[in-house]
């Protein structure tokens, strides 16, 4: 039986007593509920799927940025811009690397409720990491079933409260004035469960003009009105009253002083003010022992006010909503074995976009006033079936429509009203060879679809060297790609995992950055691109409290055809900006004991290494950014009694004090966003069973 306490009087005795205190535990199984949009063990899914569990989320950082968790997954480039006005830069297999802010080309979902609007853009900062049970990432063709997402899907799932009533409080302090405070309350009984998470985050920022403040509420109510029907209500309120924007630096400015802000950002008080509220309701009902009906409906609002470096402001007031219905079952009848899934979705986002000149960071006029809308509908289905005793297959398809609209009310500078429509028919095939109880080999292929976002059609390119114009860009086509992946999943025992995946994606009409200046970015279509690479993920419990994990990615992301942009001629073979040639993450953890959920008991320590290769910052490949290697370490102690559960921990990052580039702004004259030098954080968390 697991011990409730493991008290070791001195750090020197910790390692000597590891054999006494260590709990022999297996790795927590990665049960995937999302790869095929129905519950399925990740080992059997014909897809590249990985998850980060709560035990890692709680110690990987201050639980502010999704990059804290995603950096340890293969195929995912998660860069903390250290700029809270623009959100982290996240790409999967190179999809989404073009994003100057927010997330593109990747679908975001929180507790089953979309966190991306119909056009495909989303804000990863809206995830409540403090109360998350796990983060799942789907890469490759099976993400097609989610619609407007080429690179993959990122889902967060809130933890399920333990029986009874409990409350917790936590605080984190760190370098550059970082402070995060959180209070949580949860309760669970036979009738349902309640989880409430309230947090506040502040930082002075490492760079000049990079202070930020954020407040967040996340609440989830699980209700059971009958033995066969469950309801979930998810409420979120995310408020960022200020986030200063230091913008990017030129390579010369970065070498001179990486802490400085970009040109004109201080004098013109460049910043962003954001507020978002959302309500979602989900229902799951067992119609029979083999058939389940699921439904969801959600609505929300987001406001965004941004002051830019070239004396301008942009304001957005967005309302969004959607609904979905899904039916799944274990069989289509006695003559058709396997399981089926069919669903329909309708989503809508309407925003009032205004803009104009600014004077010293305040509004000084209006020269843009319009309504933008993104409206999508989709029908999807899949059928998973056993082909032989060792072979299983999956066939799926998604059919969808998306309409982007612009109604211009400021006509003195011309009428930029317009409408564009996109249609999607995306098939996907998957095959799994169950070679043995411990080895699965899989392959999948599909045709993906990615539309431009409202933000990407909001500006049109101007003559070379000029700032993009405020014209609705109806010339952008949707990108269409064909993806193929092959891989193996090896589970020699309950204490070790190995995943190896090779992939290739060829895209036509790739949406790429054309111009980027002073907070405005315009886009265009490139004739063709290719992404191909290899991903490896390994995890092992070595016994005596030691665990290791590693993730390796090698990727070649290039233009397959020559293209001309306002920058000049892009040669075939040029690299896609912001995508490293390779990246790696490795960690070695030790804990004197673990509970049944894999979280440490008593003392713990970890050492992490992270590296990524060179990147280019522009389509012409004239600006190159060197790769880097980073080293992080953490130590903690957790004590548990009958009613109390408390943890103290400390973490240091970039121990060797490397000067490096965290992310790049594609095709920008000042593309460099610096990474943090050596920094630290310390935290305390206490939970009481009431």
Regions inferred by a protein language model and the residue ranges of each:
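Conserved C-terminal beta-signal and adjacent last beta-strands/turns
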Residues: 112, 383, 443, 575-690
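Short acidic/polar hinge/loop motifs at secondary-structure boundaries
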Residues: 105-106, 113-139
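Extracytoplasmic beta-strand/coil segments of soluble accessory domains associated
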Residues: 34, 68-113
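N-terminal periplasmic "start-of-domain" segments of outer-membrane beta-barrel proteins
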Residues: 29-61, 86-91, 106
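Membrane-embedded beta-barrel scaffold of Gram-negative outer-membrane proteins
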Residues: 187, 292-306, 434, 440-446, ...
């Amino acid at each position: 039986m697991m011990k409730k306490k493991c008290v070791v009087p001195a750090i020197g005795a910790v390692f000597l007593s590891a054999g006494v205190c260590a709990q022999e535990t297996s790795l927590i199984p990665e049960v995937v509920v999302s790869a095929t949009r129905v519950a399925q063990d990740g080992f059997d899914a014909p897809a590249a799927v990985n998850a980060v569990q709560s035990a890692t989320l709680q110690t990987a950082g201050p639980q502010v940025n999704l990059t804290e968790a995603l950096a340890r997954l293969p195929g995912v480039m998660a860069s903390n811009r250290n700029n809270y006005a623009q959100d982290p830069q996240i790409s999967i297999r190179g999809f989404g690397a073009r994003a100057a802010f927010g997330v593109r080309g990747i679908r975001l979902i929180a507790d089953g409720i979309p966190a991306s609007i119909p056009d495909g853009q989303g804000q990863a900062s809206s995830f409540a990491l403090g109360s998350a049970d796990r983060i799942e990432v789907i890469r490759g063709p099976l993400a097609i079933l989610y619609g407007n997402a080429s690179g993959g899907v990122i889902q967060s799932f809130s933890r399920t409260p333990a029986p009874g009533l409990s409350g917790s409080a936590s605080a984190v302090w760190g370098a550059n004035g970082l402070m995060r405070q959180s209070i949580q309350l949860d309760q669970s009984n036979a009738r349902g469960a309640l989880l409430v998470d309230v947090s506040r985050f502040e930082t002075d920022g490492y760079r000049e003009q990079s202070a930020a403040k954020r407040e967040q509420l996340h609440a989830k109510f699980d209700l059971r009105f009958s033995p066969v029907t469950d309801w979930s209500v998810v409420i979120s309120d995310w408020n960022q009253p200020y986030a200063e924007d230091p913008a990017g630096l030129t390579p010369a400015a970065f070498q001179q002083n990486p802490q400085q802000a970009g040109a004109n950002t201080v004098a013109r008080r460049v910043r962003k003010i954001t507020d978002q509220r959302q309500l979602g309701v989900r229902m799951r009902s067992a119609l029979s022992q083999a058939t389940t009906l699921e439904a969801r409906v959600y609505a929300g609002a987001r406001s965004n006010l941004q002051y830019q470096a070239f004396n301008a402001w942009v304001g957005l007031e967005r309302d969004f909503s959607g609904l979905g219905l899904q039916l799944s079952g274990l069989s289509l009848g006695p003559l058709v074995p396997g399981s089926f899934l069919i669903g329909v979705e309708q989503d809508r986002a309407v925003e009032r976009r205004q803009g104009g000149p600014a004077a010293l960071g305040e509004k000084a006029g209006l020269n843009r006033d319009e309504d933008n809308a993104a409206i999508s509908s989709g029908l999807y289905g899949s059928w998973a079936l056993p082909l032989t005793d060792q072979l299983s297959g999956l066939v799926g398809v998604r059919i969808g429509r998306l309409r982007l609209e612009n109604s211009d009310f400021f006509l003195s500078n011309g009428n930029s009203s317009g409408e564009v429509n996109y249609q999607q028919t995306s098939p996907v095939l998957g095959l799994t060879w169950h070679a043995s109880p411990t080895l699965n080999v899989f392959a999948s292929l599909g045709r993906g679809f990615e539309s431009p976002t409202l933000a990407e059609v909001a500006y049109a390119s101007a003559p070379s060297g000029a700032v993009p114009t405020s014209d609705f860009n109806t010339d952008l086509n949707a990108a269409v790609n064909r993806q193929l992946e092959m891989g193996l999943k090896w589970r020699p025992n309950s204490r070790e995992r190995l995943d190896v995946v090779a992939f290739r994606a060829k895209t036509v009409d790739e949406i790429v950055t054309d111009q980027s200046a002073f907070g405005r970015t315009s886009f265009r279509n490139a004739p063709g691109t290719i992404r191909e690479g290899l991903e490896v993920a390994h995890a092992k419990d070595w016994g005596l409290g030691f665990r290791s994990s590693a993730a390796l990615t090698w990727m070649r992301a290039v233009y397959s055809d020559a293209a001309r942009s306002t920058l000049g001629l892009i040669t075939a073979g040029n690299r896609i900006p912001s995508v490293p040639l390779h990246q790696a993450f490795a960690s070695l953890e030790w804990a004197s004991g673990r509970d049944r959920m894999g979280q440490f008991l008593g003392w713990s320590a970890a050492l992490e290494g992270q590296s990524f290769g060179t990147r280019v910052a522009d389509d012409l490949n004239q600006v190159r950014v060197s790769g880097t290697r980073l080293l992080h370490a953490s130590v903690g102690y957790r004590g548990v009694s009958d009613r109390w559960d408390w943890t103290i921990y400390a973490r240091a990052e970039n121990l060797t004090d490397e000067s490096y580039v965290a992310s790049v702004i594609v095709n920008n004259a000042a593309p460099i966003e610096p990474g943090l030098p050596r920094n630290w954080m310390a935290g305390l968390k206490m939970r009481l069973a009431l």
